[in-house]
Swiss-Prot record:
Keywords: Amino-acid biosynthesis, Cytoplasm, NADP, Oxidoreductase, Proline biosynthesis
Pathway: Amino-acid biosynthesis; L-proline biosynthesis; L-glutamate 5-semialdehyde from L-glutamate: step 2/2
Family: Belongs to the gamma-glutamyl phosphate reductase family.
Taxonomic placement: Bacteria, Bacillati, Bacillota, Bacillota incertae sedis, Caldicellulosiruptorales
EC annotation from Swiss-Prot or TrEMBL: 1.2.1.41
Domain of life, source organism: Bacteria
Listed name of the protein: Gamma-glutamyl phosphate reductase
Role summary: Catalyzes the NADPH-dependent reduction of L-glutamate 5-phosphate into L-glutamate 5-semialdehyde and phosphate. The product spontaneously undergoes cyclization to form 1-pyrroline-5-carboxylate.
Gene Ontology biological process terms from the UniProt entry: L-proline biosynthetic process
Matching Pfam families: Aldedh
Natural source organism: Caldicellulosiruptor bescii (strain ATCC BAA-1888 / DSM 6725 / KCTC 15123 / Z-1320) (Anaerocellum thermophilum)
Keyword DNA repair among record annotations: no
Length: 419
């Protein structure tokens, strides 16, 4: 616990120096970090191999094991990501607006760093670098707490990044990692209001729930993606098939993958057998409502019946829940009840249904005739993101550099006093 406090203090102190660094100074630090990661690749892969062996011994497999794995190519991609962040414009110091009051006061809004940010995340070593780099570019220091599965990889990456900071002449306390992965230490970190200005959890539903229930530090919820694709009665079947297959199977272990398929009852008899066969051919397990099970059975397809828990579940795997709905209103009601406010899609040729879906579905990103897989900072055109916010304050959707800053009001006077 003392180690946690000491590292939090270092991060807080470093934040005071980072906030006034120039864009060139921050970019040089990021460039040094990228070079160090490439130089120390063998060491990083060696430490990652320890995590992989531990994970296999614990029975971790499939998409979860893949998310933990680092390779030479993946490390090169991480470094390419750093170079991409270097190219992004620095939001810090931007004057958003300025106006003059009748009394002569000139008031402006200026973008400034948030300060010291805590990140709690699960078994994805790339997040260690992504989070640190984005926080630094936005002028913030960062206290990282990864999952136990990736502890060797994460500690190695932070060690190497600190070497890059020192080479660039930047305070090494700008990046710290909590090596104690116990639940007790994580909960203690959630209460470090004295040192942390913001806490961002990245992971599954249980992690997000734990943070929201225990944190006294302000939190931005990210990541849980119980995403739906609703195929409306007017949908083009080929388009719908392509969107569903992509949303579910392209990368099933990410938060913007589709977890549920809703199909309008008027097309269920014709569309369901086709899409279920296509999904099963891709290795997807189907968990259907009673109507889905009945239609599939008539067509010689055996599928598992879904439980109530299935409708709430983010699988992060080749599993999908399938439900037949009576109308677009029923689809919207289902999504707003069971969804996680992340990304939702409708496939339709009906303009009014498309607009209704956009207006009434409560989510950070709502799609018409496109895959949910596009909810991503790069795909949205504003570069890397630290996560997908599923709440409405202070940020919503992909969180890029601007979302890692806040507003400061600057006021110029000439001796005005209030009467």
């Amino acid at each position: 616990m003392n180690d946690l406090i000491e590292k939090a203090k270092k991060v807080k102190e470093a934040s005071k120096k980072l906030m006034n660094l120039s864009e060139n100074e921050k970019n040089r630090a990021l460039s040094c970090i990228s070079q160090k990661i490439l130089e120390k690749m063998d060491f990083i892969l060696q430490e990652n191999q320890k995590d992989m062996e531990n994970a296999v011994s614990k029975g971790i497999k499939g998409a979860l094991l893949d998310r933990l794995k680092l390779t030479e190519d993946r490390i090169k991609q991480i470094c390419k990501g750093i170079e991409d962040v270097i190219k992004l414009p620095d939001p810090v110091g931007e004057v958003i607006s300025m106006w003059k009051r009748p009394n002569g006061l000139v008031i402006g809004q200026k973008r400034v760093p948030i300060g010291a940010i805590g990140i709690i995340y699960e078994a994805r070593p790339n997040v260690t670098v992504d989070a640190a780099v984005l926080c630094l570019k936005a002028g913030n220091s960062v206290l990282l707490r990864g999952g136990s599965e990736a502890i060797n990889s994460n500690v190695a990456l932070v060690k190497v990044m600190k070497e890059g900071l020192l080479e660039a002449g930047i305070e090494e306390g700008s990046i710290e990692i909590v090596e104690d992965t116990s639940r007790e230490t994580a909960i203690a970190m959630m209460k470090l209001n004295e040192y942390l200005d913001l806490l961002i959890p990245r992971g599954g539903a249980n992690l997000i729930k734990t943070v929201v229930q225990n944190a006294t530090v302000p939190v931005i919820e990210t990541g849980v993606g119980n995403c739906h694709v609703f195929v409306d009665e007017s949908a083009d079947f080929e388009m719908a098939k392509a969107i569903v297959i992509n949303a579910k199977t392209q990368r099933p272990g990410v938060c913007n993958a589709a977890e549920k398929l809703l199909v309008h009852k008027n097309i269920a008899e014709s569309f369901l057998p086709m899409i279920v066969k296509e999904l099963m051919a891709k290795g997807v397990e189907i968990r259907g409502c009673s109507k889905t099970v009945e239609i599939c059975k008539k067509n010689g397809i055996e599928v598992k019946e879904a439980t109530e828990d299935d409708w709430y579940t983010e699988y992060l795997d080749l599993i999908i829940g399938v439900k037949v709905v009576d109308s677009i209103d029923a689809a919207i009601e289902h999504i707003n009840k069971y969804g996680s406010k992340h990304s939702e899609a409708i496939v339709t040729r009906d303009y009014f249904n498309a607009q209704k879906f956009l207006d009434y579905v409560d989510a950070a990103a709502v799609y018409v005739n496109a895959s949910t897989r596009f909810t991503d900072g790069f795909e949205f055109g504003f570069g890397a993101e630290i996560g997908i916010s599923t709440q409405k304050l202070h940020a919503r959707g992909p969180m890029g550099l601007k979302e890692l800053t806040t507003i400061k009001y600057i006021i110029y006077g000439s001796g005005q006093v209030r009467e």
